[in-house]
């Protein structure tokens, strides 16, 4: 896969760390969208929101790069015939520049027909944990990749099943009122203190943390394979 400049359209420190663990050094540009979707099926919800996030950042980046591209185009059109060979070499060099890819992602937890996002209060976190304890739920992440120069894009969803052990009322309350749940879908972080309550997992662990690492890497490869056809 060619060298890429990866832009993460998320302020999640966990997604940033996952991308670093698999060899990328992303830049972070947070999307400014109000998260809203008309979708109701979990996979479609997260794919739609990931498209919105990535699209917002990609549009802002494209707008900021437009004057530079226009200037380069004007210069190339005014070159003398004697410079054409040199221009060809410069164009070849420019094609070796890293591709700019924007990555947007969204994650939800699903249980009993309900979609759980991030809790807005400790009380809501406690309610979520009561729904999750003692049973199996699904974590669903949507990811969108947009290659800025070509406009090619790819969106997918990844689902992981997580089994939570039975918890006492005190365990639920103590965890819900800690600092951990507030910025996490479903009100828990598998990579933190809540790990002691995980009874089993089926699927990609990193997906539960916030970004399916393997699927992201394979999808990046697919994005550039399609661009070579």
Positions of predicted regions on the chain:
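N-terminal beta1-alpha1 ligand-phosphate binding loop
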Residues: 2-24
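Anionic-ligand binding patches
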Residues: 2-7, 41-229
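Cofactor-binding loop segments of dinucleotide-utilizing enzymes, especially the Rossmann-like FAD-
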Residues: 11, 31, 148
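A generic short alpha-helical patch detector that favors 3-5-residue windows
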Residues: 24-25, 189
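Active-site regions of enzymes building and remodeling cell-envelope glycoconjugates
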Residues: 25-26, 43
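A short beta-strand-loop structural module common to alpha/beta enzyme folds
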Residues: 27-35
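Catalytic helix-loop patch of NAD(P)-dependent Rossmann-fold dehydrogenases
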Residues: 38
